Amino acid sequence: MNLALSLLHKRGFLKQCTSLKVLSDLMDREKIVFYAGVDATSSSLHIGHLIPFLAMMHLRQHGHMPIVLIGDSTAKIGDPSGKSEMRKILSSEEIGNNALLIKNQLQRITKFTSECFIHNSNWLDNLNYIEFLRDVGMHFSVNRMLSFETYKRRMDFGLSFIEFNYQLLQSYDYYMLNKIKNCRLQIGGDDQWGNIISGVDLIRKKNGSETFGLTFPLITRSDGKKMGKSEKGAVYLDSNLFSIYDFYQYFRNTSDSDVKTFLYLFTFLEEDEIELISNFKGNSLNKAKEILAFEITKIVHGEAEALKVQEASFAAFRGSGDRSNIPFFKFSFSSLKEEILLVDLMLDSKIVPSKSEGRRLIDSGGVYINGKRVESQSHLLTKKDFNNNEVELRVGKKKFLRIVI
């Protein structure tokens, strides 16, 4: 197998591929242009979106030429893949802003030049509908489209005609990139398989060219939960939506059984180093988790920020050191009262999802103020508890929050 494809396979990226042997031979002979797309439906990507772009970085290291397609036109429709209901329709202004933010985010992470980023509005915004139906729609079988899991799943919930068009548009994207950039490979998550092979078929029918599609597994944790979700919501790559400290802690708290898998997927460490550190046992495995958290934080947020939150994490668990990057909650006492029920503050700061959960944690001995266990549900936090205008709240073993006045 081609070296680049073999690396993706070893690291757990490869799920399905059209004509793998033919693609491998092609990549042995020449460096190819390949692409992955992302719709501008949000102002930030989350960790679940990152896998295709990490794979792109591996392929780029082997000399292949990446294109990141920003779906500013397809964002007006929304991909039904993995969705049980129609996406919210966004304004042109929202989509334009999202497209810029996502481009900047991915450029910072991948270090790709601006020339690697293309918007599909370049060809989709000025399509003539009648000509599109005649020249593109004629190559699609409705029966075959309905056989794909994306559409089969939505038939029970309702599928709008606008969403039904999405596969044609993504296929046309691939056709246009093949036409203007000689793009030979599209990559994406496995939920994109139907859209990708439809693009491969369209190109073959339109101009006889052989192109390829490759998908990656949709990452789930060993507990069966979807990768990229936390108690605080989606693990966004934007630090304004999900703090860098929480991002680091998300990976630092990886379950033992996921450490090796995530080291291969979310870092660029060499195979022998991953094999060594992922085989640590007992408490030593925590070192492997720290390495995982640091490496992926470095990729997404830069080495300087990764070092800051690593030190903050060490400080939180040691009780000393630079704690400035531990998340904080700004709080003001009422002008009439200089105390607050701790359970209320825990809910206000969102360190617990409900008062009942806060009470349960206190009863089980899992809540600490400045290192001292809270014994009562009726515990009051007063100004006397604050040292240099802050106290440290710890919930369980791993959740730390500075309460600042």
Curated annotation (Swiss-Prot):
Subcellular location: Cytoplasm
Residues that coordinate or bind L-tyrosine: 35, 166, 170
Motif 'KMSKS' region: positions: 226-230
Keyword vocabulary terms for this entry: Aminoacyl-tRNA synthetase, ATP-binding, Cytoplasm, Ligase, Nucleotide-binding, Protein biosynthesis, RNA-binding
Residues annotated as binding ATP: 229
Gene Ontology annotations of biological process type: tyrosyl-tRNA aminoacylation
Pfam families given in the database record: SYY_C-terminal, tRNA-synt_1b
Major enzyme class: ligase
Residues in S4 RNA-binding domain copies: 340-405
GO molecular function, one term: ATP binding
One of the record's GO cellular component terms: cytosol
Reactions catalysed: tRNA(Tyr) + L-tyrosine + ATP = L-tyrosyl-tRNA(Tyr) + AMP + diphosphate + H(+)
CDD domains in alphabetical order: S4, TyrRS_core
EC identifiers of the protein: 6.1.1.1
Keyword check for tRNA processing: no
Motif ('HIGH' region): 40-49
PROSITE patterns recorded: S4
Primary site of residence: cytoplasm
InterPro entries listed in its UniProt record: aa-tRNA-synth_Ic, Rossmann-like_a/b/a_fold, S4_RNA-bd, S4_RNA-bd_sf, SYY-like_C, Tyr-tRNA-ligase, Tyr-tRNA-ligase_bac-type, Tyr-tRNA-ligase_bac_1
Protein function: Catalyzes the attachment of tyrosine to tRNA(Tyr) in a two-step reaction: tyrosine is first activated by ATP to form Tyr-AMP and then transferred to the acceptor end of tRNA(Tyr).
Subunit description: Homodimer.
Protein family: Belongs to the class-I aminoacyl-tRNA synthetase family. TyrS type 1 subfamily.
UniProt name for this protein: Tyrosine--tRNA ligase
